[in-house]
Amino acid sequence: MLGPCMLLLLLLLGLRLQLSLGIIPVEEENPDFWNREAAEALGAAKKLQPAQTAAKNLIIFLGDGMGVSTVTAARILKGQKKDKLGPEIPLAMDRFPYVALSKTYNVDKHVPDSGATATAYLCGVKGNFQTIGLSAAARFNQCNTTRGNEVISVMNRAKKAGKSVGVVTTTRVQHASPAGTYAHTVNRNWYSDADVPASARQEGCQDIATQLISNMDIDVILGGGRKYMFRMGTPDPEYPDDYSQGGTRLDGKNLVQEWLAKRQGARYVWNRTELMQASLDPSVTHLMGLFEPGDMKYEIHRDSTLDPSLMEMTEAALRLLSRNPRGFFLFVEGGRIDHGHHESRAYRALTETIMFDDAIERAGQLTSEEDTLSLVTADHSHVFSFGGYPLRGSSIFGLAPGKARDRKAYTVLLYGNGPGYVLKDGARPDVTESESGSPEYRQQSAVPLDEETHAGEDVAVFARGPQAHLVHGVQEQTFIAHVMAFAACLEPYTACDLAPPAGTTDAAHPGRSVVPALLPLLAGTLLLLETATAP
């Protein structure tokens, strides 16, 4: 006869089994469901035709630290927020028809940082760890290795071709990833001149904020990073009583004012209301919006009355940039995905990924894939894992069904290293469902570190639009920059010989040579002249 404890255990197991079976749609038990779904996907794939024209516009969406495990977990979370089981609901990026893998290593490191990876996917050249916009001949923190080793970004090439260009990020605009569009520095942490050693300043090395306004003419700059633009002691408009949030510059410069003075029609804003007004004003030709002293707030902490979302910043940028008949280049970064992972707080990383995906979806609604090449990728991954055989439909932040060898619960999401390593009385603490579901919860880590690290595996590249079919297979991260340059007939691919996108004239898109088209007319004219002058 079974005892009361065994009966209770069987009851709980039966309830768990009933719940797990009850949430699975009945139609999924029928093979026809899966055969029909696969046949529909196959039919769509057979109809897929490469867009062989040139791209008028280029958009690269960069999910900082958004490895494949992050994409999968975010897909489930986004689906569950819509009251679905999770994995069956595609993300906006999932709908891009072409996918490849990108090798993210730096020249000197198996596991990369965001500075050297930015050099790879934006400039088409690999560099050394923690350097930006420089070839591998430059050495980290050695100012005298800068000059002569600069490499040029696709954004810079787009500007030279007459396109408008913009940078949108949830980090500070001087951070490693956005800086890859415009800066050349041997140290990614030289945000303002206060961060640059005196010896490097004497050698002529400029801080990243100075390069932001002087290296090239950027039409739209949106993100955080106010304090690096103003002289030390300048109060911040949002936090006037907090000295630590004020200006940091030692040279006494007001870089925002310098930027405004050089550009007719330029506008500077620091809050959401001003951004919305400026983006709708046809007299505004250049827009700089800096919404926090440093990085922007996580989406879960964002004050929607003061701080715009990534989607709103992307929409504002597209409004301004799309006015140029020659097209545009736009860099959009979900930068705080990375920061959430570094903190071992998966809730923050995944909600940032969802916001990033929302921006991708909105941009797709505001542009056409006939003339806009859109790429989505990550600079690197994280030591972020997703396992433990959780039941489908269970919370992505929940507990695995079984216990660990120490007879304690463990979460579905874990980190290989980081600040989540905790011992309580010499042992791993137990964790409850309510704890693991908190936005502030740190997932447990195997190795104790103050900050969780990047990972070295390949990351995904999603592509849609003209020349997107070139994104295939397993490629070096540098390939991304070259695909963008070729698709838009930018240097070094100005002789791309691609037809202009629909609705675009050759004058607005000079990449295709007009000489071949004129040859028959020229030959006919010469023949008529020869006939007329014949005796």
From Swiss-Prot:
Ca(2+) binds at E238, F291, E292, D307. It is found in: Cell membrane. Binds 1 Mg(2+) ion. Binds 2 Zn(2+) ions. Residues 507-535 form a propeptide. Residues 1-22 form the signal peptide. It is a lipid-anchor; GPI-anchor. Zn(2+) 1 binds at D64, S114, D379, H380. This is Alkaline phosphatase, placental type.
